[in-house]
Amino acid sequence: VVANAPADRIRHPEKPMAGVNPARWLDAMQTADPYPIRAFITCNNPLSAWPHQDRVREAFKSLDLLVHIELFANETSAYADYVLPAATGVEKGEISRASEDRRVVWIDKVIEPPGQAKADGWIWIELGKRFGFDDVLQDKYKDSALFWDEMCINDPWMKGCTQKRLHSVPWRWVRVPVTDEDAPEIETLHLEGTTALGSPEGHRFPTKSGKLEFWSPAQEAKFQALGFSALPEFYTDREQLIDLPYAVRTADGTAVRSPFAKTPADTVTSRIVQPDANSPARALKARGFDMQLITGRPAAPHFHSWTHYAWQAQEMWPDLYVQIHPAKAAALGIEDGREVTVETDHGQIRARAWLHAGIRLDTVFIPIGWDRAQPFHPWPSVNHLTDETQRDPLSDHANLKGYMCRVSARSP
């Protein structure tokens, strides 16, 4: 969606975005760097999903205003000044999640939202009207189908993905790109002899040469601006049990404009270093952090934190667990199903041990999605163990996946 407010009423920020990754916003909330964030409107569950949960809580407490838009109350709701109940897809009409095979799927509205629940679009339009944009954010756009046709598909890839076309088939989906309502769907892109959408005739790929470009001077310049090369160089996160190269910020910590961010945003220059006697991982190992923590999506019944409000999923998988190899558990005096303590250099949590022979002896796995405000089986988020400062220098994404840890038996 492209902003279409009158030109004389569009504010152009004097400073770049506080950061691509929400972890960077914590600095803006707490220290006004690069500028202050005093009010925050959010959905989902940052108080489960963001790294370094102890700091996230302090940052949210420092805000003057926190508004939470969500289907179910969760731990973020508990910190909010205002909670706005949201409507589901079948209560408003919406596009479903993007599919890996480029299918755009429309979900029809079939029932009215319960109680005071409102569609996200309704909330933002009403807020915009109160800021004086009622001539742009018109009431007609509360109809999500009309908003989709008039505002959301104004580009060549999506132009033919209209409500008329979506509803011309019982399954309500179209595989993009489709340049108009009658354009045939393309099952496989970039086949030999085809022309990429928007490219000169005969250009199989949407590049200057029409070929796959693994390196170019323009790419190299972007990577070098951050201290890297466009040619692949292996590095990983710094907390690894084995010695591997990792990226560190340059000593002066100079902020530079990211050449990869779509919206202007600052990042820092970095360099790849080889492990040595002073590397962080060796220091952690010397302190007894002798296992590798891996995080990720939980077992089949759950998806993030959404399903923790369904009693059927709770019956199948109620508790936060830590998978650990039976031999390692025996050495630590840990029994299957008993509570244990998992600790990293950034925090500690408790979880229920799941002895599993399919995991490495030196590795444990803890899923995401739990929080202390869930109605049936509250547990702490695994992100009490993660660190918001460990971010990839190119994407600015935080490391949520791998940390060195130690596990100990916990008395019942």
Range-by-range predicted roles:
Residues 14-17, 21, 48, 96, ...:
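Catalytic cores of large soluble enzymes that bind and process phosphate-bearing ligands
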Residues 90-113, 123-128, 133, 215:
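Glycine/threonine-rich phosphate-binding loop and adjacent beta-strand/alpha-helix elements that clamp
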Residues 1-79, 88-95, 169, 174-332:
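Extended redox/cofactor-interaction regions of prokaryotic respiratory oxidoreductases
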Residues 120-173, 179-182, 244, 254-255, ...:
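Long, contiguous, secondary-structure-rich segments that constitute the structural scaffold
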Residues 35, 78-79, 97-101, 105-106, ...:
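Short, solvent-exposed loop/turn segments at the edges of secondary structure
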Residues 105-107, 201, 208, 287, ...:
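Short strand-coil-strand connectors
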Residues 86-87, 357:
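Electropositive
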Residues 55, 64-65, 71-74, 106-129, ...:
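Phosphate/diphosphate-binding loops
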